[in-house]
Amino acid sequence: MSIKTEQYVTDNYPYAKKAGEKFAMDPLVILAQGSFESAWGTSNLSKKYNNFFGITAGGSKNEYWDGEIYQAQNKYKLKFRVYKNPQDSFYDFARLISSKYKSAHAAGQDYKTYAQRIAYSPYISESNGDSREGYRSAIINLYER
């Protein structure tokens, strides 16, 4: 494991564990997906805005997200959620999976089935250049690390 990888796991496993307990998901699945979405916690979105999962700003405010947004300055101009702290990002992610992606959530304790279901769900947007099969493979490989 690289130093960056070890640091990400050390820093974020406690958040994933709490979110996993609260929303009945394997914390390592949460951690794997967060590592992919945030480039091991090095992305601008995770470092500056505590958004470790690339969650866009659609939907309603909730107990983990107060409605603050950041608009990316790239060709997609997507708006992303801004979180007060990393724990809120992990909670909001697990809440989102449990409420909007029920098929993936139902497999939240089986990482291979979860990866398949989330990769082939509306969570992934191929219009933004995402590859469903690449995403599925990445989640599985990161989990197994």
List each language-model region with its residue ranges.
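Catalytic cores of secreted/periplasmic lytic hydrolases that degrade extracellular macromolecules
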Residues: 1-145
